[in-house]
């Protein structure tokens, strides 16, 4: 199932998709119970925001936890030019048809991945507003361009 999910995500620009491999977890030295905190948040389907200076280990921690929980990790590098369409998806021309292509956030929501919005503070407010319904009790992603609302997979985590 994870391989099928990873295959669906191939070709997404600006994103890194990592499947949990069957070997050892990526090395991470737990400092102060953050792994237990993360697991508790995951079990309650609560979003987590990691804050710290560049190079302090946020990405490595998420790689470690995704492996430990057996979930794929979708990493989106946020920046000031990132649009909500870059996150949720867009309509594209394919031959003479117009087709919808899910963005990395939509794919993660549908398939139950852990989605890491790296450097989210760099993204514009009009882009980040799309994640608000995912961070509360609704756990939903509105796809305004399609007129749909996607309920998050039970294993999805932001």
Please provide the spans of the model-predicted regions.
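AAA+ P-loop NTPase catalytic core and its hallmark functional loops
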Residues: 1-158
